[in-house]
Every structure is written in structure tokens, then in C-alpha cells.
Curated annotation (Swiss-Prot):
The keyword S-adenosyl-L-methionine does not apply. The active site is at C51 (thioimide intermediate), D58 (proton donor). Keywords: Cytoplasm, NADP, Oxidoreductase, Queuosine biosynthesis. GO terms for molecular function: preQ1 synthase activity. This is NADPH-dependent 7-cyano-7-deazaguanine reductase. It is an enzyme of class 1 (oxidoreductase). Its EC number is 1.7.1.13. It catalyses: 7-aminomethyl-7-carbaguanine + 2 NADP(+) = 7-cyano-7-deazaguanine + 2 NADPH + 3 H(+). NCBIfam families: QueF-II. Pfam families: QueF (PF14489). GO terms for cellular component: cytoplasm. Pathway: tRNA modification; tRNA-queuosine biosynthesis. Belongs to the GTP cyclohydrolase I family. QueF type 1 subfamily.
Amino acid sequence: MAENYAGLTQLGQTVSQPASPDQAVLEKVPNPTPGKAYMIRFTAPEFTSLCPLTGQPDFAHIVLDYVPRDWIVESKSLKLFLTSFRNVGSFHEACSMKIAERVVSLLDPVWLRIGAYWYPRGGIPIDVFWQTGSPPDGVWIPAQDVPGYRGRG
């Protein structure tokens, strides 16, 4: 079993926070139940980045759902990747899509969707949604259940 994790560089180690998403290393491990159709959900209710023009902080509730194929994302590396946006200026749409595209590139999942529920800036919340295609049949895919903005709580 340990051989499945021999290539990991972050799990179980003391590592520095990456300075940017481009420097962050996303890692994967073998799917422990290959051939089974199931969904994995990661939720980051306190995601932060910076406005690229003003430098003001932006906040989002990110929900990432995917149906794995051969690989699953190693969660510590995902956490470090997500927190690497904290001091980087990027528009909401760019942050949201970069997260989804990096995970798709790493894992080649059967299916993936992201819901990025951004808190208002200038009085307007921006929500970004994307998925790789139609959800697969036979997999329970619950709603993301992030309420429409009313204090987003």
C-alpha cells in the first residue's frame, strides 16, 4: 500500500505555502475503488484571492465535485493549491476556471463540476459554474446547496 504514496512530496511533510497557483504542486493517488462510480466533493467555504486591479481581498465558497477514473486528488496538495490564490490578483472567473482546469488536467476524471460562489464586490455577487459534460448515469450527484446571496451563510 505504501508504494501507492511513494511519490507524494507534501503529505506527511512540513512544506511551505506556494507563492502562487502556478508554483503549487497538485498531487494524485490511485483511486482506492477503481471501477466503482462515485462522486467526491471538496468544499472550500473560505477561499480567498485578490482583485487584480485594486488589491482588495475577494472571498468565495468553492464546491468542487468529481467522479474519479484512475486517480483521486491528494487533499493536502489541493488545500495548498487553493490557499496559493490568497495573495494573487485574479478575476473571479479566472480563479474558478484555473481550479477546475488544473484538477481535470491532473486527474482526467469521468466528470467534474465547479460551483464558485463569490461574495459581492460593488454590491454584485458573481457565481461561476462549469462542468466537463453531462453527469454520468448511475452516480448520486447531490445539489451543491449553496444558497443565493443573503449574507451567504
